[in-house]
């Protein structure tokens, strides 16, 4: 099967809101919706989908971010006869007492052990949940606090990286969290104008990788280069993309402010064609930039989207 682009959108209750992951061909043609809504049971509503990832079990995990829902849904990784993913269950569900940490979640990431990490905007934490294999606990339930956290702190169950309300090196306004090749967790802190690094297994705060002095301004999305050398940072305050060299510990502007019409950099992904694809959230476009020098293509890859694009992934 040829590779395809999966794109999530802001969603909501407007007529133009797109509350599904939409599929596009590698030449920008709209193909279909990725998630089979007919398979979703009554009582579950897809609204404001954000980050999504294929888990270690090959199934598709999707953030259902609307604050009243605040959950991670699981869909079969294998496509049905219509080329869609059928609903498989609610993997992580918000609960006022047992799981209050997941609140308006943003993205999901799996660690090398197959456990799931979820960043939540309203609580400004990254929470950790037992992965689908359930090696040490029931899949989807909050995991114990890492050893770096004081057990006497009144933290939501499953907290891996706490908010700045609880610890000095905590998160002020969390957005995307991803794992690097060194297995450490890189977290965009939008309001603090920095990307923070936490040790993978202990949750120990290591350092701020980049900050305002490196021209980081309201970072939201993160992406690692295929070789793991560079970290790309969407800088929302300047409508630019920075590239941090993890070996040299140096940061440069890779995509200049508003280059190619960039307005609200959101999800980023590499294509197989030598381009970096970027969701331009406020202009409802998917843009392309040369991976060598950050030069924009002469025209948008996809334009006139009905809703604000959020996350994108090349699948196949």
Predicted feature residues:
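A short beta-strand motif characteristic of beta-propeller blades
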Residues: 30-43, 86-99, 141-168, 204-213, ...
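Beta-rich, blade/repeat-based domains predominating
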Residues: 2, 16-18, 40-57, 95-113, ...
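Short loop/turn segments that connect beta-strands within beta-propeller blades
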Residues: 25-29, 76-80, 130-135, 199-204, ...
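Blade-level signature of beta-propeller repeat domains, shared across WD40, Kelch, NHL, RCC1
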Residues: 281-316
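Conserved beta-propeller blade signature
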Residues: 4-8, 59-62, 115-118, 184-187, ...
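An edge-strand/N-cap motif at the start of beta-rich repeat modules
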Residues: 1-33
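A short loop-to-beta-strand structural motif that recurs across blades of beta-propeller domains
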Residues: 19-22, 71-74, 124-128, 193-196, ...
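Short loop/turn segments immediately following the C-termini of beta-strands
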Residues: 10-12, 65-67, 121-122, 131, ...
